[in-house]
Every structure is written in structure tokens, then in C-alpha cells.
Amino acid sequence: MTAASSSAPTLGIIRLEHAKGLDLPAYETAGSAGMDLRAAVAEDRQIVLLPGRRTLVPTGLILEIPQGYEVQIRPRSGLAFKNGITCLNTPGTIDSDYRGEVKVLLINLGDDDFRIERGMRIAQAVFAPVIQPKIEERAKISETARGAGGFGSTGTA
């Protein structure tokens, strides 16, 4: 785990009752971009995610994100590679003015049932700046060498 610099913005966190005893989001290494989020399911329950199905997993956390920032919810690569478990709506955006519980929308793209247990690391949260540009409607935009080419137009090799 790493310590934030004194000039870093503060991410306020309320831990709800069903998340008591779970670790708060934390950076696992000095170079980590994302903090792991944990499943706040009841101790005596688990969520069984069937192949091809999706579910909303509670984290038991409410975030107070400073204006000018967002928190992005992203998949954990190990869950995706080993089990076919990933986040839908990726990256999910938690806006600075949202004050509800953070939940993670997971889908099982694997072949087997997947059990989500209390405290399991289910996703990553990435704290990121937000820039809101001025919107200006135009009749024309500048030309580029690429033009309107997309979806493989630059090749696949």
C-alpha cells in the first residue's frame, strides 16, 4: 500500500453497516492506478453469478468525490482472465455529485457458475480528473490525414 501525497485531493468515504469489517479501498502497490473494491455481501450469503448473467454487487461504500474529479469502476484483470468475470458499463463513472452506495455491475462471460463472497475483490476504482469543455456547434471541422476512418481503418497488424 502507498501513502497519498499531502497535496493529493481527498476522497471521502462512508462505510455502510453491511461493509463493517471490510477493508477500505486501497492501492496494492506503489504503481497501482486503481484501488480494489470489495463485495459487501452478508457473511452467511454469497451471490452465485451464472454464465451469461449479470448482477449488481454492493460495496457498502458511499464516496464524497471532490468537484472536478470522478471515480471510474473498472474490471480486475485476474477475474476476467481466470473466470470470465468483468464489469459492464466499463468504465463505470461515479460522478462527484452522486451520494448513493457504489455498486458494481458484473457479468459472467465464463462457462461456470461464479460465487461472489464477502470481502472478495470484485473491481478497481480509479480516481481521475474531469474536464468539462465548452460545447461549440460548427458547420465544419478541420481535416486530418485519417479523416473519418474508424473500426479497423488503420489495419489490424
Curated annotation (Swiss-Prot):
Q: To which pathway does this protein belong?
A: Pyrimidine metabolism; dUMP biosynthesis; dUMP from dCTP (dUTP route): step 2/2
The answer to whether the entry has keyword Hydrolase is: yes
Q: Which reaction does it catalyse?
A: dUTP + H2O = dUMP + diphosphate + H(+)
One Pfam match, given by its short name, reads: dUTPase
The protein's job, in short, is: This enzyme is involved in nucleotide metabolism: it produces dUMP, the immediate precursor of thymidine nucleotides and it decreases the intracellular concentration of dUTP so that uracil cannot be incorporated into DNA.
Which cofactors does the annotated protein need, by name? Mg(2+)
The protein here is known as Deoxyuridine 5'-triphosphate nucleotidohydrolase
Give the EC number.
3.6.1.23
- Listed InterPro entries: dUTPase, dUTPase-like, dUTPase-like_sf, dUTPase_trimeric
Q: Where does substrate bind?
A: R76, S77, G78, N89, T93, I94, D95, K103
Cite a single GO MF annotation.
Answer: magnesium ion binding
Q: Which family does it belong to?
A: Belongs to the dUTPase family.
- Keywords for this protein: Hydrolase, Magnesium, Metal-binding, Nucleotide metabolism
Q: Which NCBIfam families match?
A: dut, PRK00601.1
Which organism is this protein's natural source? Brucella abortus (strain 2308)
Q: Give one GO biological process term.
A: dUTP catabolic process
Write out the coiled-coil annotation as residue ranges: none
